[in-house]
UniProtKB/Swiss-Prot annotation:
Protein name: Eukaryotic translation initiation factor 3 subunit B
Known function: RNA-binding component of the eukaryotic translation initiation factor 3 (eIF-3) complex, which is involved in protein synthesis of a specialized repertoire of mRNAs and, together with other initiation factors, stimulates binding of mRNA and methionyl-tRNAi to the 40S ribosome. The eIF-3 complex specifically targets and initiates translation of a subset of mRNAs involved in cell proliferation.
Residue ranges occupied by any RRM domain in the UniProt entry: 40-126
GO MF terms held by the record: identical protein binding; RNA binding; translation initiation factor activity; translation initiation factor binding
Taxonomic source organism: Sclerotinia sclerotiorum (strain ATCC 18683 / 1980 / Ss-1)
């Protein structure tokens, strides 16, 4: 029978009632927030209790706070009074726009009104939305406490399971990220190998606790023996990250401003919309504050006459050594110092410094002579402005005391170089001649820990310094100079490498800095000190023509030249090496090994890595297809006191005997393992051959043939006439002595 409307049920006879359908969960989930007339209202709680007589005074006092974030007036504040003539300790306030109401909630919530009262500010629409009937359960329900699960030890890698104190490194190639134990000459031992672990690059945290992976959605931190995810920071399209020295905080930056849609964001708020930088608390995973990019002043223009945008300075936010402050430079005008973790501006104002070009925190808390309370220290420099000279300054934080200033003249540029212990600050000053056609460099060295911070000038340098590096935890330095104008050319300029150290003085003082030696006619452009000092590599990187590496020892134990008797160094070239297309050179954190690598990010020729010991002897050479990145895993600072470290150095020869024996045993066991493996392979082959021969002999017997195919020939030779044997005689001549005479 064909279907028709006659077969449809009568709506009036339907068994269900629409009013009985419960769709509250759907309404709550898909509720659309419409523009309301109450969006300009806020509710202020936490006010003191007043009566009709004192109410106007409170409103007048409150207006001072309210007007700091928007426009409101006395008539826009409604403070209800109860039947007993006293207020209910809250008030309704109307602003001129919803944006001002939102700003009031952010700026005034939690602000103390006086010693006994703290303001709590919320939007009126939020109270209606979250506080309506049914949203809050009147009956207390105890929170569900999850069962305790022990977390992995994030520094377990420091206890090498092999007991050899090995270091780890991460390698990024193609789309794979691998972490290995370094086994010196032997192949590295793989720990973890994952594909698509990151989308752009990987980065260790400063103390090696976390491995950072970069994604379009944000940043993730990994660690522990099982390499599980420890934290995630949802900053869309993130490009760069920077950790604080103590791994407490993290800065993320994206060239795309943050965009918060109507659906919101899991970690960021509407206030973060349009920002580029976010500073996070690593322990909680929460954002502390966000910032927008600053437009850097440009000194050049393009072909159309428009100013050329300068590249961002990274890191834009620089950390103090104790993780208590982070500062940002507004080039040409000020330095803003923020206190952590609240991220409030120190003393509620930026430090105004006219013309300031750059600044840098001391990498350690300097213990200055004659100062009882040690504070953090940063240095800055300003160029010549009008008739005012250029200036270098040291400022103490949080007191903002200017510890030392130095006036400079004819300055073209300056670079700030802190020594790792903050004992010294070297300001590399490029000065121009009166005609401004030539440049020369001087080094202004601040002795930060000495009383009054004296400054020593090294002005014996005739050429322009293109690279400078302090010895870590030491007082020696290396510079690279050139007489040519450095430009982006395929042929690197000719350079000179110079070494400096203090001269010997009586007592514990440090003498004046003296020149040790200069090596000319080089192509070197990079300096890499061992993290433990003493050894240094001078190399040529990112070059298409030259890729030399020279390994120097600053404390050579051999004979010292007479000219260096009064110096605190004995310089010796230990070894030279070359690595075609080398782009990166990295010391391991113990200063025992050096990895050199050629990354596909720079070129596609012979990508891979080489491994050397500190003396420059090559241990491994590993070509790696689509090689991108190599990074040693950093180590945290030692827990040993200075006395314990001194005791270890004193007994180092005794410890070395044990380590040498372990190395010898390991080498012998490795050789024994190779011999055993080869013997096992030979035995297997001999057994296989015996089985095959047995099978062949059985097949010959079945075919009626002798077991040995050579048996007929052997029988014939045995029955032959022995008289017909042929005797063969061989004569061999041997030269005993050879002389040559010339006959005239």
């Amino acid at each position: 029978m064909a279907p028709s409307f006659d077969h449809l049920p009568d709506p009036e006879e339907d068994e269900y009632d629409e009013e009985e359908l419960d769709i509250s969960d759907l309404r709550e989930r898909f509720e659309v927030q419409l523009e309301q007339g109450l969006d300009t209202f806020v509710v202020i709680d936490g006010l003191p209790e007043v009566n009709e007589d004192t109410k106007p005074k409170l409103i007048k006092f409150l207006l001072r706070k309210l007007d700091s974030v928007g426009q409101t007036k006395k008539d826009s504040i409604h403070m209800p009074i109860g039947p007993d003539g006293k207020s209910f300790k809250f008030a309704f306030v109307e602003y001129s726009s919803p944006a001002e109401a939102i700003a009031a909630c952010k700026a005034l919530d939690g602000v103390p009104l006086d010693k006994k009262h703290t303001l709590r500010v919320n939007k009126l629409t939020d109270i209606d939305r979250y506080g309506r009937e049914g949203r809050i359960d009147e009956n207390y329900t105890p929170p569900k406490i999850e069962e305790f699960t022990e977390k992995e030890h994030l520094r377990s890698w420091l206890a090498d399971p092999a007991g050899r104190g090995r270091d780890q490194f991460v390698m990024y190639k193609d789309d794979r990220v691998q972490v290995f134990w370094n086994n010196e000459k032997d192949a590295p031992e793989s720990i973890v190998d994952r594909q698509h672990w990151t989308e752009s690059f990987v980065q260790w945290s400063p103390q090696g606790t976390f491995l950072t992976s970069m994604h379009q959605q944000g940043v993730q931190l990994w660690g522990g023996p099982s390499w599980t995810r420890q934290k995630r920071f949802a900053h869309p399209f993130v490009n760069l990250v920077d950790f604080s020295p103590g791994e407490k905080y993290l800065t993320t930056w994206s060239n795309r401003p943050i965009s918060i849609g109507e659906e919101g964001h899991p970690a960021l708020s509407v206030d973060d919309d349009g920002k580029n930088y976010v500073i996070w608390d690593i322990e909680t995973g929460l954002p502390l504050r966000s910032f927008a990019n600053l437009d850097l002043p440009s000194n050049s223009v393009d072909a159309e006459g428009n100013p050329v945008k300068r590249k961002i300075q990274w890191p834009a936010f620089k950390w103090s050594s104790d993780d208590k402050y982070v500062a940002r430079l507004t080039q040409g005008s000020s330095i803003s110092v923020y206190e952590l973790p609240r991220m409030n501006l120190l003393d509620k104002t930026s430090i105004k410094i006219d013309g300031v070009m750059d600044f840098d925190w001391a990498p350690a808390t300097p213990h200055r002579e004659g100062v009882k309370n040690y504070e953090q220290l940063f240095c800055y420099w300003t160029p010549e402005i009008g008739s005012n000279p250029a200036k270098v300054g040291l400022m103490s934080i949080p007191s903002k005391e200017v510890v030392r200033t130095l006036n400079l003249f004819s300055v073209t540029d300056a670079k700030l170089h802190w020594q790792s212990d903050a004992s010294y600050l070297c300001v590399k000053v490029d000065r121009h001649s009166k005609s401004k056609k030539s440049l020369a460099t001087s080094l202004e060295i601040f002795r930060v820990k000495e009383k009054g911070v004296p400054v020593e000038v090294v002005d014996s340098i005739k050429d322009t310094v293109i690279n400078f590096a302090w010895e870590p935890k030491g007082d020696r330095f290396v510079i690279i100079t050139t007489a040519e104008v450095v430009a982006a050319t395929a042929v690197p300029p000719k350079t000179s490498v110079s070494f400096f150290c203090p001269e010997k003085v009586k007592g514990n003082g440090v003498g004046n800095f003296k020149h040790i030696r200069t090596y000319d006619k080089k192509n070197s452009n990079a300096i890499y000190w061992s993290p433990k000092g003493r050894f240094v590599i001078v190399a040529t990187v990112h070059s298409q023509q030259s890729f030399d590496m020279e390994f120097y020892d600053m404390d050579f134990e051999g004979e010292k030249p007479e000219s260096d008797k009064d110096l605190t160094a004995n310089l010796q070239l230990m070894n030279t090496a070359d690595h075609y297309g080398v782009t990166d050179i990295d010391w391991d954190p113990t200063g025992r090994f050096v990895a050199t690598s050629a990354s596909i990010w720079k070129h596609t020729m012979e990508n891979g890595y080489h491994l050397y010991d500190f003396k420059g002897e090559q241990l491994r050479e590993e070509p790696v297809e689509k090689f991108k990145q190599w990074l040693w895993r950093p180590r945290p600072p030692t827990l040993l006191s200075k006395e314990e470290q001194k005791q270890i150095r004193k007994n180092l020869r005794e410890y070395s005997k044990v380590f040498d024996q372990e190395d010898a045993d390991r080498g012998a066991s490795a050789d024994l393992a190779v011999v055993e493996h080869r013997r096992r392979l030979l035995d297997e082959w001999l057994a296989w051959r015996a089985n095959i021969e047995e099978d062949v002999q059985a097949e010959r017997e079945d075919a009626g043939l002798p077991r040995d195919p050579l048996e007929p020939l052997k029988s014939k030779m045995a029955s032959g006439d022995e008289g017909q044997a042929i005797e063969i005689e061989e004569i061999v001549e041997e030269i005993v002595e050879e002389t040559e005479e010339i006959i005239s």
